[in-house]
Amino acid sequence: MKYMIEYTIRDTGLTYDQNFANRDALLKAFSTWKPDAGLNVMAFVSDLASNGYVLVEADDPKVVASFVGKFVFWNDVRVNPVIDVMEAVPIAGAALAWARNAV
């Protein structure tokens, strides 16, 4: 299963010094991180500010929860299960056919 993880580094309401300390702690924690067994990181990108996306694949959702849990102290996170668009198109077509026949 693939998951798109959206993150925003939390800085709202922090003082100048707290913001620096928060970023410093996050960078130190991230420098020691390695993906757990069973977590395939397909893309890890930043918008060059305080937000980013991580596309991961894992058979066990607990592996994804473990990854997210490690960084939730610094980030607001949203996890969305996703499928490849080539898989989504026939599903959408079948759903449309069903909806047309349902009414």
Residue ranges of predicted features:
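Conserved, structured core segments of small domains
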Residues: 1-103
